[in-house]
Swiss-Prot record:
The lineage of its organism: Bacteria, Pseudomonadati, Pseudomonadota, Alphaproteobacteria, Rhodobacterales. It holds the Pfam family Urease_gamma. Pathway: Nitrogen metabolism; urea degradation; CO(2) and NH(3) from urea (urease route): step 1/1. GO terms for cellular component: cytoplasm. This is Urease subunit gamma. Disulfide bonds: none annotated.
Length: 100
């Protein structure tokens, strides 16, 4: 299978999000990379489903709660930026204050 660097990045984010979901199901708190991966995957999949940029910016801030993360992680994440492919092209989506 020949994947472009962009496709490899998307696959890695997706895999990290799967790991994060499994850890949440077991009650394990997420670290910084896991939290970013879960939010990023939510945005990428939402774009694929046809949701709007504005909708994903707002909804992305409600994917993870502060109590689901390790201490200090919510304070470290001021924003998450993801390039996502929408029906009308690729756009940069910024989720401000993603963990509340």
């Amino acid at each position: 299978m020949n994947l472009t660097p962009r496709e490899k990045d998307k696959l890695l984010i997706s895999l990290a999000a799967i790991v994060a979901r499994n850890r949440l199901e077991r009650g394990v708190r997420l670290n910084h990379p896991e939290a970013v991966a879960l939010i990023s995957d939510f945005v990428v999949e939402g774009a694929r489903e046809g949701r709007s940029v504005a909708d994903l910016m707002q909804a992305g801030a409600h994917v993870i709660r502060a109590e689901q993360c390790m201490e200090g992680v919510p304070e470290m994440l001021h924003s998450v930026q993801v390039e996502a492919t929408f029906p009308d092209g690729t756009k940069l989506v910024t989720v401000h204050h993603p963990i509340r």
